Amino acid sequence: MATNAKPVYQRILLKLSGEALQGAEGFGIDASVLDRMAQEVKELVELGIQVGVVIGGGNLFRGAGLAQAGMNRVVGDHMGMLATVMNGLAMRDALHRAYVNARLMSAIPLNGVCDNYSWAEAISLLRNNRVVIFSAGTGNPFFTTDSAACLRGIEIEADVVLKATKVDGVYSADPVKNPDATLYEHITYQDVLERELKVMDLAAFTLARDHGLPIRVFNMNKPGALRRVVMGENEGTLISK
């Protein structure tokens, strides 16, 4: 596909997993990865794209393991929400150091640390070309940050949810286990459900489907991939009707 002269999206919701921030470390936040992501987001802002970001917390805290050990799931999820706030603070700082105006909002009140989530305020900031980082998931236990990404994407009327992963897109099977797995360029919501492809959890995915919110899965570790996605190039997998 020929590169478009201007971006194909006006407003996006970028979903970053917590693991994406840990780089090769295996835990925590890799400063060089954080700075690279901030630079890639900066490129989008310079193209005139309005950017909302949802970050996971898996690099700092994983509630599932502790839940198996007997910890209350609600407590574990609250800890996970706080992990996403920590990642959000790091991302906001990286963006500020890259001279990008960014605002961090949390679904749970953390006065003095970041702003409370406000739909109207978020829309206003996006229109003024501020990057808005949404943290603490949906603010409710039992909902993943993928659900938060789809929910915020729908609320801010994003053109697409861009799910940044460690793989090149959605495959017919696990490419690690099956070398013959094929990469889809485009697939419908229905096909994803029928083939039980692991794109995101069912609650998040059906929310996007019911509201006609397209999802594009791509590899954030490929330099320039995010820019190629917004310029309409064939990068990753597009999931839509």
From Swiss-Prot:
Q: How is its activity regulated?
A: Allosterically activated by GTP. Inhibited by UTP.
**What's in the keyword line of the UniProt record?**
Allosteric enzyme, ATP-binding, Cytoplasm, Kinase, Nucleotide-binding, Pyrimidine biosynthesis, Transferase
Question: Domain of life of the organism in this record?
Answer: Bacteria
The cross-references to SUPFAM superfamilies, in alphabetical order and at most eight, read: Carbamate kinase-like
Pfam families on file: AA_kinase
On assembly, the entry states:
Homohexamer.
The record, for HAMAP family, names: PyrH_B (MF_01220_B)
Could you identify this protein by its name?
Uridylate kinase
What organism is the protein native to? Serratia proteamaculans (strain 568)
Q: Which gene encodes it?
A: pyrH
